[in-house]
From Swiss-Prot:
Residues 284-305 are annotated as: Disordered. This is Peptide chain release factor 1. The modification N5-methylglutamine is found at Q237. Its main location: cytoplasm. SUPFAM superfamilies: Release factor. Peptide chain release factor 1 directs the termination of translation in response to the peptide chain termination codons UAG and UAA.
């Protein structure tokens, strides 16, 4: 392992011991905010520190085995050769593991996520498939013990949604779901198709991270145009008697957000503002990412909604993930929320890209 990497790991080990000592300090325990921040830092350091300690142990084992080679006993030397081989294999495995653990983390990976699903080409069939994707993400959220809340929805005439925005709350939600952004294409025979012909429809998915209040970008109220109107969604007669629905336009960017799923105008406004903040932040993030990644590809789809990332072929029971040339004949399982079969390989490829970029930077 490179000396610079060893030095970095030694620094993290030292910091881990410092944080552990601070967590036992009475003044830190009394300051709940600082205690929480240090607890989080300790948990983030734990895995890499454990890996480095295992690496140090494997190095020590290798040195001990090399010393055994000096023994006169042939059996002992043979045993030493086996131990050297095992220690080298363990060092190689731990080095690869530590390289991944040291990769720069996306600070937003642990935040909640907004998923915006919008029907594209394909009319009613696209809206129905948007509903299918919503159900898929709902099942995936359930499997991860995340909470899901509908922020805004516009139902299709024959089922599904023309557009739906949901908030997914839970640890690591954005970190996993961010790979879902892009164009999702479906190929299947619609129920209304009497000739049995396969139709192709498209749905776009945009995943944005929630912006914590403390980090929220400043939005000038003078830049907002706020309209109220009567909700057209479900919710009983009360909804239609009051102008509880909210439409907020951010004039500088032209971003428009509508929320009408809550009975209270105040709640709809709060939800609309949180989605608006996420959308504006997403635009800023994309500008920064474009500048940083102009020299390398990114598996996290850009704001270009036309970028096709996945195809769902129902007649063949096939899912094709175009970014990594992955084909699975497990369509039913994926539609039932088994997304890790796709997201796992995507994350591995993403890590490989980051490692390659890091190697290029280090020359």
């Amino acid at each position: 392992m490179k000396e610079s990497v060893i030095r970095k790991l030694e620094g993290l080990l030292e910091r881990n011991e410092e944080v552990l000592a601070l967590l036992g300090d009475a003044s830190v325990i009394a300051d709940q905010e600082r205690f929480r921040a240090l607890s989080k830092e300790y948990s983030q350091l734990e895995e890499v520190v454990a890996g480095f300690k295992a690496y140090q142990q494997a190095l020590a084992d290798l040195e001990s085995a090399k010393e055994m080679l000096e023994e006169d006993d042939a059996e002992m030397r043979e045993m030493a050769q086996e131990e050297i081989k095992a220690a080298k294999a363990e060092l190689e495995r731990l080095e690869a593991e530590l390289q991944i653990l040291l990769l720069p983390k996306d600070p937003n990976d642990d935040t909640n996520a907004f998923i915006e699903i919008r029907a594209g080409a394909g009319g009613d069939e696209a809206a129905i498939f948007a509903g299918d994707l919503f159900r898929m993400y709902s099942r995936y959220a359930e499997a991860n013990r995340w909470q899901l809340e509908i922020m805004s929805s516009n139902e299709g005439e024959h089922g599904g949604f023309k557009e739906i925005i949901v908030k997914v709350s839970g640890e690591g939600a954005y970190g996993k779901l961010k790979f879902e952004s892009g164009g999702h294409r479906v190929q299947r025979v619609p129920e209304t198709e009497s000739q049995g012909r396969v139709h192709t429809s498209a749905v776009t998915v945009v995943v944005m991270h929630e912006v914590p209040e403390a980090e929220a970008i400043s939005i000038n109220p003078a830049d907002l145009k706020v309209d109220t109107f009567r909700s057209s969604g479900a919710g009983g007669q009360h909804v239609n008697k009051t102008d509880s629905a909210i439409r907020i336009t951010h004039i500088p960017t032209g971003i428009v957000v509508e929320c009408q799923d809550q009975r209270s105008q105040h709640k709809n406004r709060a939800q609309a503002m949180s989605v608006l903040a996420a959308r504006i932040q997403a635009v800023e993030d994309e500008k920064r990412r474009s500048a940083e990644e102009s020299t390398r590809r990114s598996l996290v789809a850009s704001g270009d909604r036309s970028e096709r990332v996945r195809t769902y072929n129902f007649p063949q029971g096939r899912v094709s993930e175009h970014r990594i040339n992955l084909t699975l004949y497990r369509l039913n399982e994926v539609m039932e929320g088994d997304l890790d079969a796709i997201l796992g390989p995507l994350m591995q490829e993403h890590q490989a890209d980051l490692l390659a970029a890091l190697a290029d930077e280090q020359g």
